[in-house]
């Protein structure tokens, strides 16, 4: 590998909206990032059903297309 062309590999801190935080190594320019979901609060890993709706997209879809009947 050529010397001096690769980005710096440094520690980055990640904080989830549930309060969980962890550290990992990356080439990101930031020292910390914020996550919406992680393995401690994601429904797949916790086994709890939860709807993650950003901006009311599901409601907007149902409002536009909910009145349509299925084809017979």
Curated annotation (Swiss-Prot):
One GO molecular-function entry? rRNA binding
Bilayer-crossing regions? none
Keyword Ribonucleoprotein (UniProt): yes
Q: Which residues bind Zn(2+)?
A: 16, 18, 38, 41
Cofactor dependency: Zn(2+)
Q: Does this entry carry the keyword Zinc?
A: yes
Query: What keywords does the record list, in alphabetical order?
Result: Metal-binding, Ribonucleoprotein, Ribosomal protein, RNA-binding, rRNA-binding, Zinc
According to UniProt, the name of this protein is Large ribosomal subunit protein bL31
Q: Which organism is it from?
A: Vibrio campbellii (strain ATCC BAA-1116)
Q: What is the lineage of its organism?
A: Bacteria, Pseudomonadati, Pseudomonadota, Gammaproteobacteria, Vibrionales
